[in-house]
């Protein structure tokens, strides 16, 4: 039940916080010649974080000449893979919820539904682990590439001590951090559901039968051996008890000598 409720929600939070992100930073370059300064340089970037395609112009503080720069890095592969896994996990969890509720008989027919569900759950657990780990590394690269201090190092005007370069504000990465958290939460949720799905498959029931058959055989052989021992003991005890009493011959034997003193006379 937890899987039905939380899997679609966690998947939505994962791809929404990552795929819907857009942010930026603002820098300022104050040249010695104030007419050449630019105190508001806005650099915007968004999903899928192809930062090498994000270009911007900054003053060189050498006349009216301007320098065209671009951010460094490309984290699009890890970000797109993460969002793709989240979208497909959301769609599958919705479809599985509909099947669980409305097509329970079809789901358990020939044990095909539980087997498919088990395989898909294992696959998505692996994909969530790989996707979340890759996106965590990609997010780390995005943070470094969009750090205002790193961007200022790209500007030739900022290498001259007479010019003043500073960051006005940095990009907000809280939603991207949340996406990584939800990615690993999805992995924990799907991996924890593997055992519950496995219990519904025929593999689990066949394994239990395989373990119970030798135990039943062992217990039946033990009971049979105990019965034979009891039978043997009761029969031997009966023979011993029968041999304790006197025989009919012993009771029937008459004395051969005289029975009275008068007869002797």
UniProtKB/Swiss-Prot annotation:
Residues 1-4, 103-114, 199-265 are cytoplasmic. Residues 210-242 are annotated as: 5 X approximate repeats. Keywords: Cytoplasmic vesicle, Glycoprotein, Membrane, Phosphoprotein, Repeat, Synapse, Synaptosome, Transmembrane, Transmembrane helix. The chain crosses the membrane at residues 5-25, 82-102, 115-135, 178-198. Sequence repeats lie at residues 210-214, 222-226, 227-231, 232-236, 238-242. Residues 221-265 are annotated as: Disordered. It is a multi-pass membrane protein. The modification Phosphoserine is found at residue 212. GO terms for cellular component: neuron projection; synaptic vesicle membrane. Residues 26-81, 136-177 are vesicular. Residues 244-265 have a biased composition (Polar residues). It is found in: Cytoplasmic vesicle, Secretory vesicle, Synaptic vesicle membrane; Synapse, Synaptosome. Glycans are attached at residues 33, 38. It comes from the Eukaryota. Residues 1-202 form the MARVEL domain. Residues 224-243 have a biased composition (Low complexity). Belongs to the synaptophysin/synaptobrevin family. PANTHER family: SYNAPTOPHYSIN, SYNAPTOPORIN. Intrinsic membrane protein of small synaptic vesicles. Probable vesicular channel protein. This is Synaptoporin. The gene is SYNPR.
């Amino acid at each position: 039940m937890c899987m039905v409720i939380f899997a679609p929600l966690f998947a939505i939070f994962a791809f929404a916080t990552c795929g819907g992100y857009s942010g930026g930073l603002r820098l300022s370059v104050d040249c010695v010649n104030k007419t050449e300064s630019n105190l508001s340089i806005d650099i915007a970037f968004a999903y899928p974080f192809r930062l090498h395609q994000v270009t911007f112009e900054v003053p060189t503080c050498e006349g009216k000449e301007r320098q065209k720069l671009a951010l460094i890095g490309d984290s699009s592969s890890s970000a797109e893979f993460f969002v793709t896994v989240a979208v497909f996990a959301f769609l599958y969890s919705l479809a599985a919820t509909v099947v669980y509720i409305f097509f329970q008989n079809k789901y358990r027919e020939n044990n095909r539904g539980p087997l498919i569900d088990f395989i898909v759950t294992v696959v998505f657990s692996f994909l969530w682990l790989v996707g979340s780990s890759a996106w965590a590394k990609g997010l780390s690269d995005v943070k470094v590439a969009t750090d205002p201090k790193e961007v200022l190092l790209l500007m030739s005007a900022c290498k001259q001590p007479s010019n003043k370069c500073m960051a006005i504000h940095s990009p907000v990465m809280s939603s991207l951090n949340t996406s990584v958290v939800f990615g690993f939460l999805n992995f924990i949720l799907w991996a924890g559901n593997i055992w519950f799905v496995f219990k519904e498959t025929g593999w689990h029931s066949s394994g239990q039968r395989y373990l119970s058959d030798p135990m039943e055989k062992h217990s039946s052989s033990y009971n049979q051996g105990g019965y034979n021992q009891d039978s043997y003991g009761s029969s031997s005890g009966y023979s011993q008890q029968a041999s304790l009493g006197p025989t009919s011959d012993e009771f029937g034997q008459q004395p051969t000598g005289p029975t009275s003193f008068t007869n002797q006379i």
